[in-house]
Swiss-Prot record:
SUPFAM superfamilies: Ribosomal protein L19 (L19e). Gene3D superfamilies: 1.10.1200.240, 1.10.1650.10. GO terms for biological process: translation. It holds the Pfam family Ribosomal_L19e. It comes from the Eukaryota. Residues 71-83 have a biased composition (Basic residues). It comes from Arabidopsis thaliana. The gene is RPL19B. Residues 60-84, 161-209 are annotated as: Disordered. NCBIfam families: PRK08570.1. This is Large ribosomal subunit protein eL19z. GO terms for cellular component: cytosol; cytosolic large ribosomal subunit. GO terms for molecular function: mRNA binding; structural constituent of ribosome. Keywords: Ribonucleoprotein, Ribosomal protein. CDD domains: Ribosomal_L19e_E.
Amino acid sequence: MVSLKIQKRLAASVMKCGKGKVWLDPNESGDISMANSRQNIRKLVKDGFIIRKPTKIHSRSRARALNEAKRKGRHSGYGKRKGTREARLPTKILWMRRMRVLRRFLSKYRESKKIDRHMYHDMYMKVKGNVFKNKRVLMESIHKMKAEKAREKTLADQFEAKRIKNKASRERKFARREERLAQGPGGGETTTPAGAPQQPEVTKKKSKK
């Protein structure tokens, strides 16, 4: 049996694959053994005496089905677990994921002008302090705080309007009082028309007893 190691190596180099992928025609071993250059190997490849084997297909359908089932929670009982809970999913990773989700949510709300920078900072510090369990709780807290601020603003506006109204009422009352004081205790001086005769003053005599 003629050794075809050199021809297989040259064919692998020409076809840019591994030596395991090279198929040499056993019926043409004599012609193949005479090929000692890359040019001769290319000619044999063109003639079909040397062939590159097709890639073996390793089906992943079973692996995909298993991964889909694991996403649904199957195959994850006590008998399938290896390692402690902390080793399987560290609490630090869970914390980082939650922080990133909540902070991204706050940034999106701030950019869309749904919250101002003061509320953003307040909520950011609460997120850091582990106040909110998930995004839904954070959203409810934001809506509640906005409703509370709106209610406080409405009450403040009502109080300010009432204060202005009372102030105006006091000013009107004070103006009327000043006007009455300016007119005098008799309700104002009575003026006699020019040219009218003045009535003499009548003095009452005291009777002696």
